[in-house]
Amino acid sequence: MVLADLGKRINSAVNNAISNTQDDFTTSVDVMLKGIVTALLESDVNIALVSKLRNNIRSQLLSENRSEKSTTNAQTKKLIQKTVFDELCKLVTCEGSEEKAFVPKKRKTNIIMFVGLQGSGKTTSCTKLAVYYSKRGFKVGLVCADTFRAGAFDQLKQNAIRARIPFYGSYTETDPAKVAEEGINKFKKEKFDIIIVDTSGRHHQEEELFQEMIEISNVIKPNQTIMVLDASIGQAAEQQSKAFKESSDFGAIILTKMDGHARGGGAISAVAATNTPIIFIGTGEHIHDLEKFSPKSFISKLLGIGDIESLFEQLQTVSNKEDAKATMENIQKGKFTLLDFKKQMQTIMKMGPLSNIAQMIPGMSNMMNQVGEEETSQKMKKMVYVLDSMTKEELESDGRMFIEEPTRMVRVAKGSGTSVFEVEMILMQQQMMARMAQTATQQQPGAPGANARMPGMPNMPGMPNMPGMPNMPGMPKVTPQMMQQAQQKLKQNPGLMQNMMNMFGGGMGGGMGGGMPDMNEMMKMMQDPQMQQMAKQFGMG
């Protein structure tokens, strides 16, 4: 996502200010604001909106700093982060959007009409929204009322078939209002919950287009009218949305092509200024690449803080409820099997492009930028191959039998076309996830250590009690080169694999040869700078 560059620049400006607050606070704030303002203007955010944001941040920070004469560095850091975060959220927030939000109801006919210019991604967005609601238990139908563009019905038909969504259209009828009415009557008789109507678009805002939209709207009486806007037009989105608003009085907006343009931030802020809520953003070409828009979630992902709420929502839509229940029961018993690990990997791979998932996980977006999506995807597939080569008994275990019987690793490596070292690394990752899952369970309200936090992990703005993740101020960063060097050290010291797994898994007992682990060798390895950095990342340094 090109918007990630904007996030990096804002983060850089904030982090520089945080590290220099011990000098002159006012100067540090002004330097930070210069960096933020430049980044926003280059992303095509309206200059008046940027000026307002700058003034708000500056006045709040200087006022708070004067009133709190004995603030610590940690308090100053939190103040800067929270103020910048809150003001960026305001920049993309439509006032009263929550009160205006349309919520479709099951067992009732909900008609949604789409409008917009040709080429904005309107027809594709219709299918994406149909898939979104279908996943949530609604019975959804698509109607093509675009009789102007050649191939419009074919496009919607192909998309609908691929997404397994019922559709209606006509190759002969030229009256769009009549086609829309016929389609709605058909789906009403069949008790559909949601009927989505796609309308014609034009290359320009022609009077005929607006008149056609009014005629269709008068006939079908939609519960919600959605305008689809191309995010690549930047702040010009404001003028376009106002022109449509005067004619069709739409109630919400979907912004498309947010994955490929730096001007998306400008489009969002411009639309928010028109006081029309953005309900979804398109983040790719796949039919699942539609995200519910929330100002806090958007800014969190932009700044690399992550969006755990959206991640959980996506996990729920693709995960098997019985599998999830079984995994949770295992975790509560203090057990996380290789089969649980495999199911988690398969669920993640169903969620669409890894770059979209990485934005929701704190610190992961930067890692994806360093390693690359294709390489990461290939590694995940290889992990599944390794797990597929294990027996039922092995998958239902917690991995100890591989340590007790190393020949099992050799067999799995041969069966999956990988190396013994790669099998070892997957076992180590499973142990790390087991420890994290058990820790999360222990820290639920009422459990011992419920308020415990990992050492060195700061809270992030707008996300109370949410521990920060890698790449934040004060945290060391593990680079791909460091990981490769650490892996080389493990290859050169194969006996240390047991020790690493003991360290991550809470002590699994029994060595490769049945003896005590060689702690002297372990200590030597952990004194290496690369390994120390890795240890700190996992809260062990």
From Swiss-Prot:
Major localization class: cytoplasm
GO cellular component, one term: cytosol
Disulfide bonds: none
Keywords, sorted A to Z: Cytoplasm, Endoplasmic reticulum, GTP-binding, GTPase activation, Hydrolase, Nucleotide-binding, Ribonucleoprotein, RNA-binding, Signal recognition particle
Region (M-domain): 304-541
Domain remark in the UniProt entry: The NG domain, also named G domain, is a special guanosine triphosphatase (GTPase) domain, which binds GTP and forms a guanosine 5'-triphosphate (GTP)-dependent complex with a homologous NG domain in the SRP receptor subunit SRP101. The two NG domains undergo cooperative rearrangements upon their assembly, which culminate in the reciprocal activation of the GTPase activity of one another. SRP receptor compaction upon binding with cargo-loaded SRP and GTPase rearrangement drive SRP-mediated cotranslational protein translocation into the ER.
Protein name: Signal recognition particle subunit SRP54
